């Protein structure tokens, strides 16, 4: 079953989010500490009005276990959503940081799509994408895919996403794919 996340999903969703964006989280908190990175994501997940909030998250649940998650939001809201993250980093870790904008007005942006390693390849990622496409029927959906993740890129292409351009994020190049 696919449903909107709740704050109580944080312990299950944060590790999935980290799996999809570990290098970016390490840069944000300026530590290569897996447990601290997951704590960082959990704290943001339970809050409202930020990129990583439960408000922006769909979960795939089976037998009361969360097996996948998809975080998305309207690209027009990237500035206030990311500012909340940067403010949290300043308050929690004491440093200022800014990353390149990963999206913009005119698209709904998939920030992370992640499936538990034990059930990858079983259609969960595809199900989450299909659900989002149905929710956002008629809207443009964008995402960034790492140059080192051809498996994910193939999934997105099978789901109808096409290459739009290249973007930099946290100092690394990503392919910007869109679905219209």
Walk through the language-model features, giving the residues of each:
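A short beta-loop-alpha structural element at the N-terminal edge
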Residues: 1-15, 23-27
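Conserved GNAT-fold acetyl-CoA-binding loop/helix
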Residues: 23-45, 56, 89-91
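Conserved GNAT acetyl-CoA-binding A-motif
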Residues: 106-108, 129, 135-147
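Conserved beta-strand-loop-alpha-helix junction that forms the acyl-donor binding cleft
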Residues: 111-120, 143-153, 168-174, 179-180
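Conserved beta-strand in the GNAT
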Residues: 59, 65-74, 109, 114
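Conserved acyl-donor/pantetheine-binding loop and adjacent beta-alpha core of acyl/acetyltransferases
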Residues: 74-112
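A short helix-loop-beta-strand connector motif used in the catalytic cores of GNAT acetyltransferases and
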Residues: 45-59, 76-81, 109
């Amino acid at each position: 079953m696919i449903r909107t996340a709740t704050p109580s999903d944080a312990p299950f969703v944060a590790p999935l989010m980290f799996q999809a964006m570990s290098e970016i989280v390490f840069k944000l908190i300026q530590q290569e500490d897996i447990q601290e990175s997951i704590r960082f994501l959990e704290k943001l997940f339970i809050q409202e009005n930020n990129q990583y909030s439960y408000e922006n998250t769909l979960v795939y649940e089976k037998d009361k276990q969360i097996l996948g998650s998809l975080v998305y939001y309207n690209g027009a809201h990237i500035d206030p959503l990311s500012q909340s993250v940067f403010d949290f980093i300043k308050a929690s870790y004491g440093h200022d940081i800014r990353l390149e904008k990963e999206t913009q007005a005119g698209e709904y942006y998939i920030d992370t799509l992640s499936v538990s390693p034990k059930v990858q390849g079983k259609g969960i990622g595809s199900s989450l994408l299909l659900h989002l496409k149905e929710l956002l029927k008629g809207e443009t959906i964008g995402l960034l895919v790492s140059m080192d993740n051809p498996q994910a890129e193939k999934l997105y292409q099978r789901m109808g996403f096409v290459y739009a351009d290249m973007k930099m994020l946290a100092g690394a190049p990503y392919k910007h794919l869109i679905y219209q």
